[in-house]
Structure formats: structure tokens, C-alpha cells
Amino acid sequence: MNIEQAARIPATILIVEDDEHISQVLRFMLERQGYQVTHLADGRAAAGHIASASRPALVLLDVMLPYIDGFELVRLVREREDWRGVPVLMLTAKNTERDTVRALDAGANDFVIKPFQPNELLARVRRHLTAGA
């Protein structure tokens, strides 16, 4: 595969979100922009995926998840050597300074409050994907 062919492969974004409506909205938005999407609905499934799957281009990660929360999942991402550079954007309805600081301290690259504005979220995704290119 040459550089031109590699550039045409759509970036894969991992969504870890337990709210079905939000995950469907995220998938729709991202697929319309040409991204490939993998969705997992709970922290246990995400931990297994992080341990065994190839790295995505970016992770959109809910904070409050069943079984394992988003803060712990960020730590798992940062512990896996081949995933360390993957940008992690945390999504949450919790709008407190404490949660923002906790997410950033855990290793998240960005923190987005729900309900989010679609264009803003897409701009953040593009910024993080471009920064990692």
C-alpha cells in the first residue's frame, strides 16, 4: 500500500457510549463525514477491546458507563503502548471542574459536555485527528 492509498482509508473512531440515542447520533454524524465507527456500549466491552484490538484513530468516551467508568478506560488506553498516542475525547453530562480535571489528569485530550453541539464536536474530532497525523 502506498501513501496515497493509505490516505484514502477512512479513520476509525471508537465510540464508547451506553446511551443508545447518543451513540446513534454520534455514529450518524461521524459516518456522514467519512469515518469508520466502532461502537461499544459498556466499560467491560471497551476494556476487552482496548486489550485486544488494533488502535483506532480516536476514541470518544463517555464518563459514566456500566462496569468500568471512562476515567479507568482512559488509564487503560494510556497503559497500552500502541494506543498511548490515540486522542481521547471524553463526553459527559457532568459539568463540574472536578470532573474535567479528573478526565484530563487521567490522560484525556479533551472534554466535551453533553448535550454537545454537533459542529463543535466534529471540529474537535478533526483537530485531534489532524494533530496526530
Model regions: which residues?
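The feature encodes the CheY-like receiver
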Residues: 66, 84, 96, 114-115
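Conserved acidic carboxylate
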Residues: 17
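Non-catalytic signal-transmission and effector/linker regions of two-component phosphorelay proteins
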Residues: 1-14, 119-133
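Charged docking surfaces used in two-component/phosphorelay signaling
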Residues: 24-32
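Acidic, metal-coordinating helix/loop segments flanking the phosphotransfer/catalytic sites
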Residues: 39-58
